[in-house]
Amino acid sequence: MRTRLDHVGVNVRDLAAQTAWYTKAFGLTSVFEFHLEGPGLSGIVLAHPHGWRIELLARPGSAPGLRAPDPLTAALTEGYGHFAVTTPELAPVYQALVAHGAGEAVPPGPSPEPGIRMAWVTDPEGNLIELIEKNAE
């Protein structure tokens, strides 16, 4: 089966604020925006220069979902828990995201997977983001 992950969708409370944060923190650019009048759903697809994309969705009357402070707590709830990005330089990326307002969930350290280092942050609304450095020494 020939498939490829296209994007990750994140439901947000404040579309404008989250768009500004993801754009600034990750260097993303807008691909397209949309609004569905009937349900009042608004969204934007943002792209990274390396090809990954994220879709931010907002709808009036939404309620907060999973807001776990770390990945171990998130694993107590079934369903979507986080998205992950890779980087060749874990510590500087972690620090840059924190400097842009990311919450510190798990500082850089070894992953359970051999040769991998990881860290976790949260976006301004508390959504978990995993950072992965492969082939770490």
Residue ranges and their predicted role:
Residues 1, 42-47, 85, 94-137:
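Vicinal oxygen chelate
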Residues 14-15, 88-90:
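Helix N-cap motif at beta-to-alpha junctions
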Residues 32, 68-74:
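Short, P/G- and charge-enriched loop/turn segments at secondary-structure junctions
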Residues 8, 83:
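Hydrophobic adenine-recognition pocket in adenosine-nucleotide-binding enzymes
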Residues 52, 60-63, 137:
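Active-site/binding-pocket entry motifs
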Residues 2, 10-54:
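Core segments of cupin and vicinal oxygen chelate
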Residues 56, 73-76:
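Helix-adjacent hinge/juxtasegments
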